[in-house]
Amino acid sequence: MRSIFYFALAFAALTCSNASAALPNPDETRLLSDTFTKRSLRVAGQEAARGEEIVRVTAQSTNKIFKRPAEKDMSKLIAAAKKALLEKKMAKLSKVIKKPAK
């Protein structure tokens, strides 16, 4: 089991060194990893590391898409939820009543 681990470790080390040796400029490996980091941060929506401007733009765009629950009238939401729960219970009861007894 230990030999498999050492083999995998050696393979990973050789792969990384060969990939960096294949590029003519050794600094390009660092640039490629920086680009990957930026892309992964964009996907996660965590561009806060680049500055306050990006955070504000991101926050404004999400506020346009989704309204915050605090801005909505919560009493209407609670009433709608209670109504949906009551309808669900009534549907269950109607299924039980309609089943023929064997």
UniProtKB/Swiss-Prot annotation:
Record flagged with keyword Oxidoreductase: no
Domain of life of the native organism: Eukaryota
Motif (RxLR-dEER): 39-53
GO cellular component: extracellular region; host cell cytoplasm; host cell nucleolus
Chloroplast recorded as keyword: no
Domain description: The RxLR-dEER motif acts to carry the protein into the host cell cytoplasm through binding to cell surface phosphatidylinositol-3-phosphate.
Entry's family note: Belongs to the RxLR effector family.
Subunit record text: Interacts with host KRBP1.
Function: Effector that enhances P.infestans colonization of host plant leaves. During the early stages of P.infestans infection, interacts with and stabilizes host potato K-homology (KH) RNA-binding protein KRBP1, leading to its accumulation.
Identification of the protein by name: RxLR effector protein PexRD41
Organism in which the protein naturally occurs: Phytophthora infestans (strain T30-4)
